[in-house]
């Protein structure tokens, strides 16, 4: 006991959902065998399919799936395989989309499927609370709080890491405006006949913000939380590894949309990053942790003074931000 040392391993708390990345099919097959053998040492078992292990001699279902993510130029031509074998009896099937930790991941790495699913869930949630949200006898501020807590929370769950296109924001904004009109007892015909603008409904009647501003706020809070992490944290390293655009990098026809470009657009809209910097850490991290950050964001996004705040966090002693 005198030779023992204490090690804090907080990431070892999670032992349920596991996602692994392999760079080739051979690595996937060999790595799956190593993971299965390692789990057996701890008395754990991976739920994989068994040949002929189901009813009527059919293959049993597998709770473990694999997904092939081909290169961008090969995604239209390369077919998805059905499964791969671990041994003579067990196999792991492939899938084109998979729900992992509440988010839907597709083989083309496009967030359209996840955003459409969020819109469907938010629509169902709004219909459940419609009698309360559209009840004119209830105070407007209470209905607005209920809408933000129940409907918007479902709609924008996980939006901090979305790769958002302009068409995605249009769909989200359209749903938000349709719900707010219903809360005021209006439709498009009323707005057209009486010249009622969306700004009038959101700001004057319901005291709400446009959905794109709410989206930017959520992403900024996430980026601020990551910027205040210890640089040794995996989340900080993952963000910093893709935050800077390579010098001389040329974009393909049409602007490529990914998580980096979405974060960069949010930082530019908020005045925390210039358009030429590519979102480099040395620029936007000191800005988002600076004392005037909230003032800059409020001015750029048109928010009322004092309405946007970050949770205060101490300056890191080694990095200085």
Regions found by a protein language model. Name each.
Residues 1-321:
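Short linear motifs embedded in intrinsically disordered, charge-biased segments
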